[in-house]
């Protein structure tokens, strides 16, 4: 009991001491500020309990004159501080300083000599205009520096000298117009660099070479139009790069190959018009690829994404013109699990595209204008265990009988196994105005089964076939037409035609050069009778005009009959020879060709012709039969002789001039309506009642070279 008063005195003493210390700390805390222990993460993401002084958003004009001695984090965000004058009183253990959203106009107004323990400094959203030499020299332990959203237009070559431990540097959203590699010579340990939203316009080779440990680079929104081949040289540890919101019109393939350890690539929101063969290939560590929000992207071509053994995810969404993905676009991607293709202009996705991805687990193709026909029927054939994301948003747009139905609810047997080609309306515009001597690329893509072949027709009626160079024109195998150094002479209406065994589709574009529109020069239109039989007439035509549309209308009338009703056929304007069949013997016909122009007018010319009698035609047929037998016999003889020598003969083409021609020896007449029946139905807009005369188009030969 004697010790009780002593214990009471001791406890009272301790309590008084604690109260005194608490009172001292409360006095040290700046007025209106909050001083407390808060959780905090270091730049290395290490969690700690830090003594924090929170003076945010108090309208302070000056830096606090006094701070608790144990302060570790000082928050002065959203005040009106223009300079720091009491740096000598800084707590020695201060590790984090937030001066963002103040009125600092110069780093020289921040005396950092007593802040050697600082790890993080936030200076964003101030009024800094430059970073002079050695402006932060005293911060030898600094790991994070945020100078983004200022007015920086100049950074001295040695501005970052002394910051050899810096890990993160944020310079985005300033007024920098160039990148100087000397900035980075003092930053050997930098891992994250943000340079986006500066009016830099271009970067140079070796710009980032000193940054040997850089892991993440963001150069978004700087209006880049190209990336030099050696721009990323030296970045052997780079794992992530973002080119978001620039003006790249093609993938910087060569430059990306220099970043050998790249894992995450962001090319979103660039006007890249197509992903070409080999654009993303042999990038052995790439895991995620983003090609979203590209306003000009039309297609992903064959082998565009190839041999990426570690790729897990592709995002190609919200591309309003992306209408075509080649069946072999994604190749040798053994670990790809997620394929995001929603909200594009895709009418179909080939089954071959999915079959080439053995580890695919989920796919998103909703919010696309799906055409429910042969190309997409695989979805409902239970041939895949892939999960379709948001299946309730996957609807048919075409054909009319399925419009509005959910794709997964249309039975695959209701879709044809083969179907007409379809050129996406988004492939290219209907009118294009370009400057003289410029380079023009027109991207035409079509889906169908069997896969269609694509060729182009020039304003002068010449046919341009794939992989063929002709004057200023070159057509790529995928369907892209390149025109080099275009002049007003090459202006006019260009037509892309996609054909397969079922039929054809076409789409035209009017190209103006320097605002010049080709005028109707009333060029000549001539019809020539090439051959007359009892039941058919072979006619050809030639027109000197650059404004003709892509379809030609042939019409035949029986002159001896009162009725003027007649059936007609529409064909591509590059078909210069046409065979009218199923005619009556010894009958006079009026055959007319009607060619519309781009000015809603038409060129029309007619010719009168009388078919031969059956007797007269029979004699000629006999002669033709003899000639045919002789030709066949001679051909068999030649083949026999060649076989004796172990050679293989292949019959050459029988094409004459630039059009369909007659070859009675080698090629029998094939009805155009049998070869391309849907094509005739598609283009025939007449709703007339069937006439007594049946006129059908007949293809005499399929051209194999350019016109």
From Swiss-Prot:
<feature type="repeat" description="LRR 10">
    <location>
        <begin position="285"/>
        <end position="304"/>
    </location>
</feature>
<feature type="glycosylation site" description="N-linked (GlcNAc...) asparagine">
    <location>
        <position position="93"/>
    </location>
</feature>
<dbReference type="InterPro" id="IPR000372">
    <property type="entry name" value="LRRNT"/>
</dbReference>
<keyword id="KW-1133">Transmembrane helix</keyword>
<feature type="topological domain" description="Extracellular">
    <location>
        <begin position="23"/>
        <end position="626"/>
    </location>
</feature>
<feature type="topological domain" description="Cytoplasmic">
    <location>
        <begin position="648"/>
        <end position="707"/>
    </location>
</feature>
<dbReference type="Pfam" id="PF13927">
    <property type="entry name" value="Ig_3"/>
</dbReference>
<feature type="glycosylation site" description="N-linked (GlcNAc...) asparagine">
    <location>
        <position position="579"/>
    </location>
</feature>
<protein>
    <recommendedName>
        <fullName>Leucine-rich repeat neuronal protein 3</fullName>
    </recommendedName>
</protein>
<dbReference type="GO" id="GO:0051965">
    <property type="term" value="P:positive regulation of synapse assembly"/>
</dbReference>
<feature type="domain" description="Fibronectin type-III">
    <location>
        <begin position="523"/>
        <end position="614"/>
    </location>
</feature>
<dbReference type="InterPro" id="IPR003961">
    <property type="entry name" value="FN3_dom"/>
</dbReference>
<dbReference type="InterPro" id="IPR001611">
    <property type="entry name" value="Leu-rich_rpt"/>
</dbReference>
<keyword id="KW-0677">Repeat</keyword>
<dbReference type="InterPro" id="IPR050333">
    <property type="entry name" value="SLRP"/>
</dbReference>
<feature type="repeat" description="LRR 6">
    <location>
        <begin position="189"/>
        <end position="210"/>
    </location>
</feature>
<feature type="repeat" description="LRR 12">
    <location>
        <begin position="335"/>
        <end position="358"/>
    </location>
</feature>
<feature type="repeat" description="LRR 11">
    <location>
        <begin position="310"/>
        <end position="332"/>
    </location>
</feature>
<dbReference type="Pfam" id="PF00041">
    <property type="entry name" value="fn3"/>
</dbReference>
<dbReference type="InterPro" id="IPR032675">
    <property type="entry name" value="LRR_dom_sf"/>
</dbReference>
<feature type="repeat" description="LRR 4">
    <location>
        <begin position="141"/>
        <end position="162"/>
    </location>
</feature>
<feature type="glycosylation site" description="N-linked (GlcNAc...) asparagine">
    <location>
        <position position="382"/>
    </location>
</feature>
<dbReference type="InterPro" id="IPR003599">
    <property type="entry name" value="Ig_sub"/>
</dbReference>
<feature type="glycosylation site" description="N-linked (GlcNAc...) asparagine">
    <location>
        <position position="103"/>
    </location>
</feature>
<feature type="glycosylation site" description="N-linked (GlcNAc...) asparagine">
    <location>
        <position position="522"/>
    </location>
</feature>
<dbReference type="InterPro" id="IPR036179">
    <property type="entry name" value="Ig-like_dom_sf"/>
</dbReference>
<feature type="domain" description="Ig-like C2-type">
    <location>
        <begin position="421"/>
        <end position="514"/>
    </location>
</feature>
<feature type="signal peptide">
    <location>
        <begin position="1"/>
        <end position="22"/>
    </location>
</feature>
<feature type="disulfide bond">
    <location>
        <begin position="444"/>
        <end position="496"/>
    </location>
</feature>
<feature type="repeat" description="LRR 5">
    <location>
        <begin position="165"/>
        <end position="186"/>
    </location>
</feature>
<dbReference type="InterPro" id="IPR007110">
    <property type="entry name" value="Ig-like_dom"/>
</dbReference>
<feature type="repeat" description="LRR 1">
    <location>
        <begin position="70"/>
        <end position="91"/>
    </location>
</feature>
<keyword id="KW-0433">Leucine-rich repeat</keyword>
<dbReference type="GO" id="GO:0031012">
    <property type="term" value="C:extracellular matrix"/>
</dbReference>
<keyword id="KW-0812">Transmembrane</keyword>
<dbReference type="InterPro" id="IPR013783">
    <property type="entry name" value="Ig-like_fold"/>
</dbReference>
<feature type="domain" description="LRRNT">
    <location>
        <begin position="23"/>
        <end position="69"/>
    </location>
</feature>
<feature type="domain" description="LRRCT">
    <location>
        <begin position="368"/>
        <end position="421"/>
    </location>
</feature>
<dbReference type="GO" id="GO:0044877">
    <property type="term" value="F:protein-containing complex binding"/>
</dbReference>
<dbReference type="GO" id="GO:0005615">
    <property type="term" value="C:extracellular space"/>
</dbReference>
<keyword id="KW-0472">Membrane</keyword>
<dbReference type="InterPro" id="IPR003598">
    <property type="entry name" value="Ig_sub2"/>
</dbReference>
